[in-house]
């Protein structure tokens, strides 16, 4: 067995994803999800040695109980896995301006993550809990914990991309600017695209679309991010599962002044009650929207708005490619599986030379990627993302 094993942790506010990955060859020895934290139904499920298992964590369980279960129950079944761990990689949603790349976790790094809590109030506190619990659970790896930031890849954006047209002192004094998200995924699929297209990364011009319950589009020119659709927070940009994406900011004042909604209620509306859920009034699940597009008005409405917004972003980012666009890339749960989203969106972009092959598009689902465009037209690639591998690679590289 390899001695390049890394434990990857992705702590959310009410869940914890985990995996043990060989950082050299990408082999996955363990993967799982603990969820429903602080609720009676808190539970954990995992895959190891080709088998699937699950268990209850106990009412009210959270990150501490989940990590204890991973260490004392799951890994006790395979002590050689635990013995061969060389590092722990932590996904961190927001690193502010301080972090342009992954970093070994020190007191200074922890402070930087804390300083970014206002920009990711649900995610960063959970990451800090996960780091603390990992340090307790794996004391022999205290100096081998690495933070991998979702925002780091976007730190190459030029000023004209990341500044808002607000009073400049809000940026200078309060760091209010665009940061983006999903950077680890955009980084991974762009590097995979370079291999597919047989181009050096530093010459690669692509537009990457990470589409899941959250979604973002990134313009990558000469291998570096030059713009991305998410902003100060992950609320800006595309239509998402429950998030509105771009709106006229004055809608907020109207909701407050004319409809009497308070700030907390407006925040809930924009982040948890909008997007596909708001448009269908039924669900945030894109599968419902796709399955019922031809027969239900709510599904058609949601799909059309979703694809219109996505096509607008792809089209506008094409203008940043300095005359050469190598491909558009789809990834994430929706990007990898929702053939209708890809086809309807690219159908609006014939001006850019996209022409989807219907059969290829249908075939590129459920873990299968490939070029879904017709021969002789601009490539449209489906590339399954692997953020966990990037986190494992960075953790191993920094601690080896």
Swiss-Prot record:
- EC numbers for this chain: 2.7.2.1
- Report residues binding Mg(2+): 10, 387
Q: Which Pfam families match?
A: Acetate_kinase
The entry's cellular-component GO terms read:
cytosol
User: Is Cell membrane among this UniProt entry's keywords?
Assistant: no
Catalytic reactions of this protein: acetate + ATP = acetyl phosphate + ADP
Keywords, sorted A to Z: ATP-binding, Cytoplasm, Kinase, Magnesium, Metal-binding, Nucleotide-binding, Transferase
What binding details are noted for the cofactor?
Mg(2+). Can also accept Mn(2+).
Query: Which amino acids does the record list as binding ATP?
Result: 17, 210-214, 285-287, 333-337
NCBIfam families in alphabetical order: ackA
Tell me what this protein is called: Acetate kinase
């Amino acid at each position: 067995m390899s001695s390049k094993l890394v434990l990857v942790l992705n702590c959310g506010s009410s869940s914890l994803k985990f995996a043990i990955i060989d950082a050299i060859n990408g082999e996955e020895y363990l993967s799982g999800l603990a969820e429903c934290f602080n609720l009676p139904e808190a539970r954990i499920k995992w895959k190891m040695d080709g088998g699937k298992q699950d268990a209850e964590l106990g009412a009210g369980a959270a990150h501490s109980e989940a990590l204890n279960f991973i260490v004392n129950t799951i890994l006790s079944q395979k002590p050689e896995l635990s013995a061969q761990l060389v590092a722990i990689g932590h996904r961190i949603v927001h690193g502010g301006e301080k972090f342009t790349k992954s970093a070994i976790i020190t007191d200074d790094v922890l402070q930087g993550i804390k300083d970014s809590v206002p920009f990711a109030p649900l995610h960063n506190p959970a990451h800090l809990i996960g780091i603390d619990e990992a340090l307790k659970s794996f004391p022999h790896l205290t100096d081998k914990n690495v933070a991998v930031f979702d925002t780091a890849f976007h730190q190459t954006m030029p000023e004209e991309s990341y500044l808002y047209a607000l009073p400049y002192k809000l940026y200078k004094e309060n760091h209010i600017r665009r940061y983006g998200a999903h950077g680890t995924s955009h980084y991974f699929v762009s590097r995979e695209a370079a291999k597919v297209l047989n181009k050096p990364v530093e010459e690669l011009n692509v537009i990457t679309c990470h589409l899941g319950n959250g979604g973002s589009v990134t313009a990558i020119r000469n291998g570096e991010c030059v713009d991305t659709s998410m902003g100060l927070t992950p609320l800006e940009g595309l239509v998402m599962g429950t998030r509105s994406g771009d709106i006229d900011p004055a809608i907020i004042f109207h909701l407050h002044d004319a409809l009497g909604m308070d700030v907390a209620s407006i925040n809930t509306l924009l982040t948890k009650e909008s997007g596909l859920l708001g448009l269908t009034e039924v669900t945030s699940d894109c599968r419902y929207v796709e399955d019922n597009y031809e027969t239900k008005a709510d599904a058609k409405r949601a799909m059309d708005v979703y694809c219109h917004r996505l096509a607008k972003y792809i089209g506008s980012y094409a203008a940043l490619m300095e005359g050469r666009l190598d491909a558009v890339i789809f990834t994430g749960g929706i990007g990898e599986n929702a053939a209708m989203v890809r086809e309807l969106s690219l159908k609006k972009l014939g001006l850019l030379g996209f022409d989807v092959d219907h059969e290829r598009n249908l075939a590129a689902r459920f873990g299968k990627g490939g070029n879904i465009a017709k021969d002789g037209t601009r490539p449209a690639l489906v590339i399954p993302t692997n953020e966990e591998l990037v986190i494992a690679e960075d953790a191993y590289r920094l601690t080896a």
